[in-house]
Amino acid sequence: MRVGIVGATGQVGTVMRRILTERNFPVTELRLFASARSAGTELDGVTVEDAATADYTGLDIVLFSAGGATSKALAEKVASQGAVVIDNSSAWRKHPEVPLVVSEVNPHAIKDRPKGIIANPNCTTMAAMPVLRPLHDEAGLEALVVATYQAVSGSGLAGVAELHGQTQKVVADAEKLTHDGEAVDFPEPGVYKRPIAFNVLPLAGSIVDDGLNETDEEQKLRNESRKILEIPGLKVSGTCVRVPVFSGHSLQINARFARPISADGATELLKDAPGVELSDIPTPLQAAGKDPSYVGRIRSDETVDNGLALFVSNDNLRKGAALNAVQIAELVAAELKG
């Protein structure tokens, strides 16, 4: 397969390159693309090309992870030159002619791609889908209440640098925060609205200007869950929270079903679910650098009929972005080979 990566020098693009190698993806030719600023540099012996001016003719699959604006500008052009585009941004997820795919959940959806583009879900949605699919198949999912605990790497390298820098700056005096949240002078926040070190921010993403006071992250969770699980009427209430963790998103999920399902029954279903691993105490540190969605703390939710509560942790850079894109590419490669 002749493969391209747009955004190859970025955080997710770097992980994509690593995962292609780890999974022995059948790459016969690899081309790397990034901004004009990075063009001409070398990565693993491959010269990076300017994504905006490159000719993509001859490529079979192109993975995009360079942000929504780049995907909007280039994805259709690349698809028109013959490649199947797998896009990691939010640019195409809601488009009715673009399938939104989690490899273990709805792989059949890749076949219906009239625009030649397949979208990768948001990282928080991605973590939940392999867990919710078997539960929905068993009991009929009706509603979700979700609180997320999202790592700073979800904001890119700048988020990682901000947490690291703030932590280094104040760690020597951090004990003073025990009794007074203003006892330490934090560096001025840049990426986030408030200091992220030793703190929790109930605002992951940006407020959408539609009067609902939800963030785009919260709306992605609702819209993408409906599309992937093929439940257009699914009710979803999310609160997306940024936490001082470098990598690994976690979700507390309270789910309501149409039919009874016990905690033991759910555990049995999830034991063999693809992309899922049971864990007594799932944590982002456990998930970082790993592929599965780790799920635990499975119990009944007594506030609703047929309710379950559970906790999920997943690496937002691997399965939450790069791994799923490569897994979709594997499905496409198998199809193209016939």
Swiss-Prot record:
Q: Which GO terms describe its molecular function?
A: aspartate-semialdehyde dehydrogenase activity; NAD binding; NADP binding; protein dimerization activity
Q: What class of enzyme is it?
A: oxidoreductase
- What SMART domains does UniProt report for this protein, alphabetically? Semialdhyde_dh
Task: Please give the biological process terms from Gene Ontology that the record holds.
Answer: 'de novo' L-methionine biosynthetic process; diaminopimelate biosynthetic process; isoleucine biosynthetic process; lysine biosynthetic process via diaminopimelate; threonine biosynthetic process
Q: Can the keyword NADP be found in this entry's annotation? A: yes
Per its record, the protein catalyses: L-aspartate 4-semialdehyde + phosphate + NADP(+) = 4-phospho-L-aspartate + NADPH + H(+)
Q: Which residues bind substrate?
A: Q150, R242
Q: Which family does it belong to?
A: Belongs to the aspartate-semialdehyde dehydrogenase family.
Assembly and binders: Homodimer.
Q: Which NCBIfam families match?
A: asd_B (TIGR01296), PRK14874.1 (NF011456)
Function of this protein?
Catalyzes the NADPH-dependent formation of L-aspartate-semialdehyde (L-ASA) by the reductive dephosphorylation of L-aspartyl-4-phosphate.
Q: What is this protein called?
A: Aspartate-semialdehyde dehydrogenase
Give the organism's phylogenetic lineage. Answer: Bacteria, Bacillati, Actinomycetota, Actinomycetes, Kitasatosporales
